[in-house]
Regions:
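PDZ/PDZ-like peptide-tail recognition elements
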Residues: 1-8, 34-35, 45-47, 53-69
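Conserved PDZ fold ligand-binding element
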Residues: 4, 9-27
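Terminal peptide-recognition signature
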Residues: 15-18, 44, 82
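PDZ domains, with a preference for the canonical peptide-binding region formed by the helix
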Residues: 20-45
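Conserved Radical SAM active-site core
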Residues: 50-52, 58-172, 176-200, 210-236
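Structural preference for beta-strand elements that scaffold enzyme active sites
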Residues: 132-134, 170-172, 203-205, 248-250, ...
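Flexible glycine/acidic-rich beta-alpha junction loops that bind and position SAM and/or redox cofactors
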Residues: 145, 180-181, 201-225, 244-267, ...
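Radical SAM enzyme core and accessory elements
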Residues: 260-410
Length: 410
């Protein structure tokens, strides 16, 4: 059952329980959406103050109700490399919630561990067609996975994946490479095991473990390990292209940057199945830069701030704009922000605090008409990860698309 938060129907009081639609039991908002969309709703069963009541609708009448915010499942694991576990105090409150809920995986692409999933959940996922899902696998070795997740249920990963696939669910997997733990021989085995579940496993993303100054027990992926991992994964990628007509396994951009190797061409990424996981973002950015042409003159002086990881690509954008003569030399600067909040091992733009941006801007001797911040550095409310805001009318948070960014500058 699910509670109605608001109703425009006089016959349905607020805070009423919604029990069923057309005799289909409703357990949460997903079932409400599923059955309300797929059927021509004629009747619902509600309960208010212990009294059940059936409400009948006319053929052309729509249900005008809003449901209460659902309660999502929390993670039951205790991974040493968990970014949320290592967060300091004083950040945005929502950042501290460790979700591990298949509904959020389906709705917004959050990765889940499958350690809290039941047979009923799997059947329900199949019935509601909640596909695709995103799963953090890391390793298919049951003993090692139990140790990594510190959860006795973690060893059932291959069984859970197979059951979901049997219920016609497609899955995108993630492997976090932890030096000395999930790399090398173990990575080889994990990719091999997951590939046996193709096409149910649609893609495998391989990403380096994140390390901050608040998480000291995990070693960073070195340049040498990045190079070895690229060699291993690209062999699988070539093999899968021949066998399955798709690369299937893809490396995070960070591996190539760490290794000092070129970013693969767009064909490598196929339809970019794990773009939001930092896999293929650099290539799309590079191609957008190359596609820039006939850009109108940009007047004024601009500063683009970024994390160290993206610095080479934004410098490439600067050179392109100067080459097109749409901006005068010296009128645009690109600067990497040192991440003092999490430590300089954190180089992605989305994890730069408001305090670090303020510190960097205050040190700039040159005067700028516009200061461009990365698109991922604030939430929808304009707040940085440290819950701060910046009041400076020169600041523009960059759009994700380069052409839209250029429009902001003109």
């Amino acid at each position: 059952m699910v509670r109605i938060a608001y109703s425009r129907e006089k016959k349905i009081p607020n805070s009423t329980l919604l029990l069923s639609i057309n005799d289909q039991k409703i357990d949460d908002f997903l079932e409400y959406q599923f059955y309300n969309d797929m059927t021509n709703t004629r009747k619902i069963l509600i309960e208010n103050k212990g009294v059940k009541k059936e409400v009948v609708f006319e053929p052309d009448e729509k249900i005008a109700i809003e449901l209460e915010e659902p309660v999502y499942r929390q993670c039951e694991n205790d991974c040493d490399f968990c970014f949320i576990n290592g967060l300091p105090k004083g950040l945005r409150k929502k950042l501290y919630f460790r979700d591990d809920d298949y509904r959020l995986s389906f709705l917004i692409g959050n990765f889940l561990s499958l350690t809290n999933i039941s047979k009923y959940d799997i059947q329900r996922i199949g019935r509601l067609k909640l596909s695709p899902l995103y799963v953090s696998v890391h390793t298919t070795d049951p003993k090692l996975r139990r140790r990594i997740f510190k959860n006795d249920k973690a060893g059932l990963i291959m069984q859970h994946l197979s059951s979901l696939i049997d219920n016609n669910i497609n899955i995108h997997c993630q492997i976090v490479v932890i030096p000395g733990v999930t790399d090398g021989v173990n990575l080889f085995k994990t990719i091999t095991d997951l590939s046996t579940l193709y096409p149910g496993i649609s893609s495998i993303g391989v990403v380096p473990v994140g390390k901050t100054k608040h998480i000291n027990s995990i070693p960073m992926v070195s340049r040498k390990l990045a190079q070895k991992t690229i060699s291993l994964v690209e062999e699988f990628h070539k093999k899968f292209r021949k066998k399955y007509k798709t690369g299937m396994v893809y490396l995070a951009d960070e591996f190539y940057i760490k290794a000092g190797l070129p970013i693969p061409e767009a064909q490598y990424y196929g339809d970019f199945p794990q773009y939001e996981n930092g896999i293929g973002m650099a290539r799309k950015f590079i191609n957008e830069i190359k596609a820039l042409n006939n850009t109108k003159k940009i007047k004024g002086k601009f500063l683009i701030l970024t994390g160290r990881l993206a610095l080479p690509f934004l410098e490439q954008l600067k050179r392109r704009l100067e080459k097109l003569r749409c901006i005068e030399n010296g009128n645009i600067d690109v600067l990497a922000v040192d991440n003092l909040f999490f430590g300089n091992s954190v180089t992605v733009s989305g994890l730069i605090s408001g305090a670090d941006f303020v510190r960097t801007i205050s040190k700039c001797e040159k005067k700028y008409d516009r200061i461009i911040l990365p698109p991922t550095c604030v939430n929808d409310s304009g707040r940085f990860i440290d819950d701060k805001t910046i009041n400076d009318n020169r600041i523009i948070v960059s759009p994700h698309n380069i052409k839209e960014l250029i429009k902001c500058l003109q």
